[in-house]
Amino acid sequence: MANKIWGSNNEPLKIQFITDTHYYSRKGGTEGKAYDKAESKSQKVIKDSDLVIKAGFDMLCEDKSTDIVVLAGDTTRDGEIESHKEFIEMLRDLKKRGKRVYVITATHDFRDGGVADGYDGDKKIEVPAVENRHDLWDMYYEFGPNEAISTHPESMSYVVQLAPGYRLFALNDDTNYKPEGERGSGFSDDCMKWIMEQLEDAKKNDQFVIAMTHHPMIAPSPFYAIIGKGDMQKNHETTREIFADAGLSCMLTGHTHIHDISYVVTDKGNTFYDIACGAMIGCPPTMRNVTIDPKNKKIDVDTIMIKDVPGLDTNQKPFDEYMKGFFFGMIGEIVWAMGNDIDRLAEMTDAFSIPGEKVKKLAWLIKPIGKWLNKLTFKKVWRLCKKESGLKKADIADIADNKVVDFILELVQNLYCGDSPYGPDTREYKLTCGLLNVIDSFLNTIHLNIGKFLKG
């Protein structure tokens, strides 16, 4: 039986939601061959992140209908100390302009070993980075934890009273999942116990709960569920069921840089929503307006697109269109390099957390697959997965000779930008899912987790 909605007499509350700002201090170096090489394989703006974030913050401040801003992690590029210092000053300025700011940190905000990449001419150098993630709690204490009505210091999670009848659960899932010495995203047993206690307290006090965490709890597409398993929160299927059945129905997430809203319904009939937002400095460069209206049993979500960035040369294009060409040009080059230039591929895969050295070691496998993929047509795909797709030859006659690579590039663009022209009923969707299921079944048969294997 579905839960009663808590805070059902509340007036609507609007929240501005941002994530994955990935601020980079120019003090780390922005010129020379080493920097140019890093920028060429990045899926996000690096040296001009300050300009983009300032433009985004200006847009937030133009909206006087709410004073609440929440940020779901990855505040910096790679945890550089100078990046943190400068970004914190930007957040302080945001508060001075009338915003209440609530932050959690995440994967890119610290570095084991305490160093990150910087650039000096032709050389990549080391720059100081935050080494102990718990130092981030003190660094960002003025952005949420200082207002907390309850905290879980080990995970760096906290609860704040946003407004009468509304509580924000800021749940830091980074390296929080620790069974038998493992370390990964998710929630430890002790953290889950604390969360459930806080949900029970919210229920007793008739408080509507809105939550944020960094890693996704619902895959933004069936394709991502297969290729991006390693980027999902650990135990996300179980955890989201527990949350939904305990009255937590809406989670704001980041990490993927994908603009998406997905939901699942539990066995008990409770709905859980994962509202993901793109990175401000990526593609798409978005922010969200989230308006919660428990009285009318709805949550409205609007997209804010960053289109104008003063001081940034975008070749006279709106910033979002500029980033689309930048990012998807890189995706096309990656697909081409798979079959033609392994060294170039190895340089670019770091942007997707796949070590270049691992790519080079697998060149014997990747290159023939890449050549095959670049020549692959839907007719050939259909022959491989007739049964899985449920399609007949006549069903695909008009797309039989279309190249799958062109469709993949469009699919990735749709995935990141939040468009869904290829729904479950389309031939392209059925063929692609059929092929991925064939590949996934084969990998499971030989006990190979491709995501874990590639990321080492």
Q: Which residue stretches match the model-derived regions?
A:
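His/acidic metal-ligating clusters that form di-metal
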Residues: 62-68, 100, 167-169, 181-273, ...
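N-terminal active-site segment of His-dependent metallophosphoesterases
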Residues: 1-81
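Active-site environment of divalent metal-dependent phosphoester hydrolases
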Residues: 24-27, 77-79, 107-115, 176-179, ...
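Extended active-site neighborhood of metal-dependent phosphoesterases/phosphodiesterases
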Residues: 5-7, 81, 86-193, 268, ...
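Divalent metal-coordination and catalytic microenvironments
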Residues: 20, 69, 74, 87, ...
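Active-site-proximal beta-strand elements of phosphoester/diester hydrolases
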Residues: 12-26, 165-176, 212, 273-278, ...
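Non-catalytic terminal accessory segments
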Residues: 1-13, 311-456
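Alpha-helical scaffolding within the catalytic cores
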Residues: 52-56, 152-158, 195-197, 235-238
